[in-house]
């Protein structure tokens, strides 16, 4: 069963300007260490950050709260499997919200997809509840 769906569109050029203006202050407020290492190794640094920004916004929407209701930016983190597939991790209040919205006898699975076509980065997040295996 679907528990939540969220999407977001981020402007890569806006993220690039924010990185230029605020640098580490912005990076450290929004992105985990793992996300920063990944982004800084990429040719398109701003695009990588923009996709993760969009993923966090989309996840907060799928959780039904948005970022205004206590979820911190770093409560959500995007990593990648070796195949390149993005994976959303939640901690803190985001994890608490996910647990609260998951029906008994189910486990929540967060699906995330990222794309970009300059100057836009987009993310979709679907939160699904799957029955626990006996």
Curated annotation (Swiss-Prot):
Superkingdom of the source species: Bacteria
GO biological process: fatty acid biosynthetic process
InterPro entries: 4-PPantetheinyl_Trfase_dom, 4-PPantetheinyl_Trfase_dom_sf, ACPS, Ppantetheine-prot_Trfase_dom
Molecular functions (GO terms): holo-[acyl-carrier-protein] synthase activity; magnesium ion binding
Cofactor(s) of this protein: Mg(2+)
A cellular-component GO term for this protein: cytoplasm
Ranges that cross the membrane: none
SUPFAM superfamilies according to UniProt: 4'-phosphopantetheinyl transferase (SSF56214)
Keywords tagged on the record: Cytoplasm, Fatty acid biosynthesis, Fatty acid metabolism, Lipid biosynthesis, Lipid metabolism, Magnesium, Metal-binding, Transferase
UniProt enzyme class: transferase
EC number annotated for this UniProt entry: 2.7.8.7
Coarse class of the protein's main subcellular location: cytoplasm
Assigned protein family: Belongs to the P-Pant transferase superfamily. AcpS family.
Protein name per its UniProtKB record: Holo-[acyl-carrier-protein] synthase
Organism of provenance: Roseobacter denitrificans (strain ATCC 33942 / OCh 114) (Erythrobacter sp. (strain OCh 114))
Encoding gene, per UniProt annotation: acpS
């Amino acid at each position: 069963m679907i528990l939540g769906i969220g999407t977001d569109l981020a402007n890569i050029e806006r993220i690039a300007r924010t990185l230029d203006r605020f640098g580490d202050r912005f990076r450290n407020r929004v992105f985990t260490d793992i996300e920063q290492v990944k982004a800084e190794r990429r040719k398109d640094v701003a695009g990588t950050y923009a996709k993760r920004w969009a993923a966090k916004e989309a996840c907060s929407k799928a959780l039904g709260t948005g970022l205004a209701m206590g979820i911190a930016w770093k409560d959500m983190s995007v990593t990648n499997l070796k195949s390149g597939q993005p994976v959303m991790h939640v901690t803190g209040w985001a994890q608490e919200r996910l647990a609260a919205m998951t029906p008994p006898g189910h486990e929540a699975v967060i699906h995330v997809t990222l794309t970009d076509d300059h100057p836009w980065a987009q993310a979709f997040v679907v939160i699904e509840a799957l029955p626990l295996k006996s």
